[in-house]
């Protein structure tokens, strides 16, 4: 009850918690390591490893994000949608660099592949309700990244 006194509404509490979790996730990334990596798919993988490490160390974040993703309240959905869109923009800046498009057979596919990976991440979030086997998810994700790289990159970038 005192929590609701402090925040006033469930909406304000969820908003605070969601932005707190988002901030914690952003801090998990080693930006210099990601920037030093010249390959899009390698940056995506490295960022994913950093994210999963943080989620393993802070299981409450995964639990909250999973419950928030299934929240039905229209007021909360707007806040969560906005926060998730901001998170996607942050991730795009983090892993998709302008020079990445030259490696793709069709340069315009770089942005589409990134968007597809974000949709994949949304699907993975839906698994949070049923418990998380991070190792299995990461193994599957690594295979997907490998497959995408070999299907979308020009031959000279596959060495």
Predicted regions and their residues:
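Short, hydrophobic secondary-structure boundary micro-motifs
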Residues: 62-65, 77-78, 107, 159
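Amphipathic alpha-helical packing segments from all-alpha helical-bundle domains
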Residues: 23-32, 42, 74-101, 111-119, ...
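C-terminal peripheral helix-coil segments that are non-catalytic and often amphipathic
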Residues: 50-53, 89-97, 118-120, 126, ...
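Short, flexible helix-adjacent loops and helix caps
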Residues: 26, 30-37, 67, 100-103, ...
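Helix-turn-helix
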Residues: 1-12, 16
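Short, flexible helix/strand-to-coil boundary loops that buttress conserved ligand/catalytic motifs
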Residues: 17-18, 29, 59, 65-66, ...
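Amphipathic alpha-helical segments used for helix-helix packing
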Residues: 55-75, 126
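Hydrophobic alpha-helical connector segments
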Residues: 16, 20, 30-57, 110-117, ...
């Amino acid at each position: 009850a005192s929590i609701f006194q402090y925040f006033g509404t469930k909406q304000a509490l969820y908003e605070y918690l969601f932005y707190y979790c988002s901030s914690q996730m952003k801090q998990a990334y080693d930006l210099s390591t990601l920037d030093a990596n010249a390959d899009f798919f390698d940056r995506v993988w490295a960022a994913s490893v950093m994210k999963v490490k943080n989620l393993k160390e802070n299981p409450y974040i995964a639990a909250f994000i999973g419950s928030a993703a299934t929240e039905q309240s229209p007021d909360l959905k707007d806040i969560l949608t906005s926060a998730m869109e901001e998170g996607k923009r942050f991730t795009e800046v983090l892993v998709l660099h302008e020079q990445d498009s030259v490696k793709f057979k069709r340069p315009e596919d770089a942005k589409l592949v990134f968007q597809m990976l974000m949709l994949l991440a949304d699907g993975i979030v839906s698994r949070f309700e049923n418990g998380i086997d991070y190792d299995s998810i990461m193994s599957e994700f690594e295979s997907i990244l490998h497959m995408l790289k070999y299907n979308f990159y020009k031959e000279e970038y596959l060495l």
